[in-house]
From Swiss-Prot:
It comes from the Bacteria. It catalyses: (1R,6R)-6-hydroxy-2-succinyl-cyclohexa-2,4-diene-1-carboxylate = 2-succinylbenzoate + H2O. Its EC number is 4.2.1.113. Pathway: Quinol/quinone metabolism; 1,4-dihydroxy-2-naphthoate biosynthesis; 1,4-dihydroxy-2-naphthoate from chorismate: step 4/7; Quinol/quinone metabolism; menaquinone biosynthesis. Mg(2+) binds at D135, E162, D185. The gene is menC. The active site is at K107 (proton donor), K209 (proton acceptor). InterPro entries: Enolase-like_C_sf, Enolase_C-like, Mandelate_racemase_C, OSB_synthase_MenC1. Converts 2-succinyl-6-hydroxy-2,4-cyclohexadiene-1-carboxylate (SHCHC) to 2-succinylbenzoate (OSB). This is o-succinylbenzoate synthase. SUPFAM superfamilies: Enolase C-terminal domain-like (SSF51604). It comes from Mycobacterium leprae (strain TN). It holds the Pfam family Enolase_like_N.
Length: 334
């Protein structure tokens, strides 16, 4: 079912979720939620994203609100803790929000910080969690990444380096130089050809996110063409977007790694009761936002109008596609 623009706007709720610490350069996360006939969907493309890229996120939100979820193969998903680029002294406080979690992803290569800061943070995490992976968000050159790999493994192993460099060619070059597995994120979700990183033998692990890839159906189609392990991660989603990620993870034939779906713990408040990991797992199931929370977290009128205008622009870029759950695709996906 494809909603009209008028119907979509009538079902829209725009909220601002305050964060416990600065993450990805922001302290408040704005998202638009869609109260659809099949459930709730989320449109949360980051504010700086241009309409064509953001339109994939709108497709994902429409699919969740109007489509049918895939059949699941598991009813709970192992998750990793996410540690922002905080000081080493703040690490115990962050990890305390992820009870039972045995894997942590640590942000590194933060602008304004240095490798020594990263080493201190990673070692502080290593004292409390069994398995550590790091995410540079493409912040290093090949040479800097190679040096970081040595420094970050001096006191213990890393599960993998996530997006250490920005380009597929750089990832491939680094992979030839280091023994640590390389994971690709931005090289998949922001690429015109999300499979190029696999064909180039540039990664050992694929980090896939539902919203940037255009929804669960598109996510699963891409995952089916990737012959390396998949890690499902969030895009700093609200509990609504996290739910879509859990459903996608539950539908994968294999799930070898803990997933980055615990980022809800980074928010001070969310639109529904926060999901708490139990023994390092989150349950798979639907979510319904609390009306009181929707109202309390609602944005001022000017911000709501900004999101309405954004939905209008992105919606105008979508084209019908009978093969997708949402019934829509971005123009470049045709």
């Amino acid at each position: 079912m494809i909603p009209t623009l008028t119907e979509l706007l009538d079902r829209l709720h725009v909220v601002a979720l305050p964060m416990r610490v600065r993450f990805r350069g922001i302290t408040t996360r704005e998202v638009a939620l869609i109260d659809g006939p099949a459930g709730w969907g989320e449109f949360g493309a980051f504010l700086e994203y241009q309409p064509l890229e953001a339109s994939a996120w709108l497709v994902a939100g429409i699919e969740a609100a109007y489509g049918e979820p895939p059949e699941g193969r598991r009813d709970r998903i192992p998750i990793n803790a996410t540690v922002p680029a905080v000081s080493a002294t703040q690490v115990p406080e962050v990890l305390a929000r992820f009870p039972g979690v045995r894997t942590a992803k640590v942000k590194v290569a933060e602008p304004g910080q240095n490798l020594a800061d990263d080493v201190d943070r990673v070692n502080a995490v290593r004292e409390l969690v069994e398995t550590v992976r790091v995410d540079a968000n493409g912040g290093w050159s090949v040479e800097a990444a190679a040096q970081a790999a040595v420094a970050l493994t001096a006191d213990g192993p890393l599960e993998y380096l996530e997006q250490p460099c920005a380009t597929v060619a750089e990832l491939a070059a680094l992979r030839r130089r280091v023994d640590i597995p390389i994971a690709a994120d931005e090289s998949i979700r922001k690429a015109d050809d999300p499979l190029a990183v696999v064909r180039s033998h540039a990664a050992d692990v694929a980090v896939l996110k539902v919203a940037p890839l255009g929804g669960i159906a598109s996510f699963l189609a891409i995952a089916a063409q990737i012959d390396i392990p998949v890690v499902v991660s969030s895009a700093l989603d609200s509990v609504v977007g996290i739910t879509a990620g859990l459903i996608a993870a539950a539908a994968l034939p294999e799930l070898d790694y803990a997933c980055g779906l615990g980022t809800g713990r980074l928010f001070v408040a969310d639109v529904a009761e926060p999901m708490l990991p139990v023994d390092g797992f989150l349950p798979v199931g639907p979510v319904t936002p609390d009306p009181a929370r929707l109202q309390a977290l609602g944005t001022p009128p000017a911000r709501r109008q900004w999101w309405i205008d954004r939905v209008k622009t992105c919606y105008s870029l979508l084209v019908p596609c009978a093969g997708d759950q949402s019934g829509l695709r971005r123009p470049r996906d045709r």
